[in-house]
Curated annotation (Swiss-Prot):
It is found in: Nucleus; Cytoplasm, Cytoskeleton, Microtubule organizing center, Spindle pole body. Belongs to the SPC110 family. Residues 118-725 form a coiled coil. Homodimer. The gene is SPC110. InterPro entries: Spc110_C. GO terms for cellular component: cytoplasm; nucleus; spindle pole body. Component of the spindle pole body (SPB) required for the proper execution of spindle pole body (SPB) duplication. Potential role in cross-linking filaments or anchoring other molecules. It is essential for growth. Keywords: Coiled coil, Cytoplasm, Cytoskeleton, Nucleus. It comes from the Eukaryota. Pfam families: Spc110_C (PF18520). This is Spindle pole body component 110.
Amino acid sequence: MSSVMETPHAGKLKKYEFTPIGYAEEKRKEGIDLLKENGLKRSLESGSDLPAERKRVRNPSVVDETFSSTRLFNDTSFDETVPEGIIQERRPNSRKNLVDDLLIKDQETTENLTSNPLKETESSLKKLQMENYNLRIKCTSLLKFLNNISDDGEIVKNLEILDELDDLKVRYRQLNLDYTALQKQCDRIEDQNDEHEDIAKLKESNDKLKEELRSTKENLIDTDAQLQQLKDTIKSLENKIFNMRTEQTEKECQHGMQVDLLQSKINETSTSLTSKERECSDLKEKIKWLTSQLQEFDHQSGSLLDLQSTLDSKNEAIRNLEAQLQRNEHQRQSLEREVSLLQEELSSIRETHQKIITHKDQQIKQLTENLSSSDSEAVKRLNELSSERLRLLETNKSLKFSEKDLKQTVKSLEDQLNSCQEELHASQDKHKEKVSELLRKQLPYTSSEVEAMRQELLEMRKSNDILKTENNSLSRRLDNLIRQSPSKKSVEVDIQRKNNEIRALRSTVKDLEHELQDVTSNVSKLKENHKEEIQKLRKQVNPDLPTDVLEEKSKLQNRISLLQMELNSIKDTKEKELAMWRRKYETIRRSNEELLQEGKDQSGQLSNILNEKDKEILQLQSRFNSLLTEKNSLLNELSKVRSHKDDYKEELKKNQSRLEFITKEFVKLKDASKQAENSEDAKDILNNKWYSKYQSMKDKFLGELKSLQDENLELQKSLLKQKANPNSTAEVFSKTTEKGTLKDEIDYYRLKYANEVKQNNDLKTMNQYLNRVLRASSQHVKLDILKLQNEVPVYNPYADIPFHNMRFSHQKIKFKTVALLVLSCIRMKTTIEARRWDRQRLDYLKRKIVLNQDNISW
């Protein structure tokens, strides 16, 4: 036969009566005890389990058993050492054997809860811990009774004190014997010394010697103190001498360094001065060459005059063309004004003509209407009007022709204007080309030389400024070094010599500048003289030329000089702009290079960060693997714990039997001590027995103490290692947290499973209840229909029943209905609370597992 699959806890389902709300009353054969135990079990089941589970979930790592431990200690501190019969007399309601009851309960729970092995193992582990604790308490109580040990468990101290007491007793006896022997010897010596007469003298001499000894000791102490002081002073003086020597050596090194620096700087200044002298000589040579070039330029200025004359002629032609252009523009503007006036007149004439035509048409119509009255007059009038009309049409045609002529004249004028403008543009272009050619021809002779001169002057000024700044900085440094250096006089002499040289150089530079100014003034004077001589020669060559021509030539020359000046200024501005753009380009290039460098640095930093992150990922992976291995090991340990459960039970049984044996022996010893209270021999025998037992216990405890001390040392070493290696502590913490999370996950899934089982059971019961209600209601409806069919008469089609005679039974509410309602409300409240608590616990565990935070409480 195939077994039907059922959900766990299916046996807990209750049998319901056909009642509207609530549980069914249990059968009478189950008894009153079953009703007490199972009456509200299903509704309060989850609520009763809540506190224990809540405590365990709040603090999973540490099991707090303070209340149970104090209770057990109070119960079994002294009573456990007394035989069982006496304990039962004192406490008739107490249990005989705690371990047996615990084992039986454990077996019952394992039989009942086969579907939840995790809970079973946890409960068994808790019970084993409790049993172990009880056994420890019993052992401590026995030790207290036997050896009068304190509550703190100070076993070793008491044993050591007892050993010391025995040793002290033995020593006391020996000392007493030695003291008696010494007393006897002293008595003998005194008896012998009474015979001698020189005892007083010996005593006096002995006292003097003692005083001398004391004085010598005091003197020795004083001399030792003085010696110590002298040694300290010598040490301090030696330290001071050593420090002074080190400072002196350091100062000597610093002075040597400063002297070397000064010598190097003096050498640098001498080299720079020689280089400057060379530069000055080069500049003089350049000035001479420039003067020669200027003279050559003055000789070549004759060819420029022809060019200037051609330029003047072209300029005059351009001016004439510009004047013609202006005239043409004025004519065009006047013609445009006339055209606009004519157009206005034409429009006004057209309007008047239209008005006249309309008026005449109206008159013709009137005349045609009045033909019958005045035909002859009308015909005449008509002829006149038609003649007038023809005349007006001819005038209109003539006006149109005049308008066309005006338009043609305007077009011709515009064409002339455009041609003039084109000629002007062409002449301007030619003029520009000729000017540019002239400038190009003059440029290699003038601009290059002038620019070279300017650049050389600028360089000279810059070098002079740099020399001044260097001289100032050198003088400041030299002053500072002279103030600090020990060899002051020699350095001052050197500085004065250098200053004199610098002054001489400055004077030479000033002389050179004056010479340059004189040369420039001479060049300008020579140019003026040259011009005057050229003018005189021209006058001599052609004296017939009028003064006006000469004045115009001078004007042209002045204009050429102005143009050259403008050209030079344009070139200067161009050069400045080029320099500015070059600076901007250099700044942009530098910024670009800096940005590229920053980008490279950032990329390097990012690559370093990436490498670090990769290393961290590898470390985390290794840690994850280690945690997985630890998890597997923990799971193996858990399986081992489950397997060793039976072994623990057997060990508990053995410990229990041993405890019973110890209590029996204790009872026997107590009986023997009561029987042998009177006889001294029996007391000695008992004392010997106790002493032998004491010795055996002492040896055992000492062995245990040694083992515990070794363990303590090992633990201390491991603790020190853990402090040295913080990674190990982190691993331990991770292990503990992993255990905590494992426990939380187990609790979470166990709770969820229990809730789902309860829900399924509730749904089953509801389904059964509703099916029963439907069946019963259908049966009642069928019966009611049959009754109605039988009761309603056939002859009365409208069922005319006298309703006023019917009695309606107003029954009172029974106590049973009220009680059932109250019971249902209470049960609803308890179920809602249990449901809410379960939901809260599930949410708490879920958050704790997801966030991995043990600090969260609910």
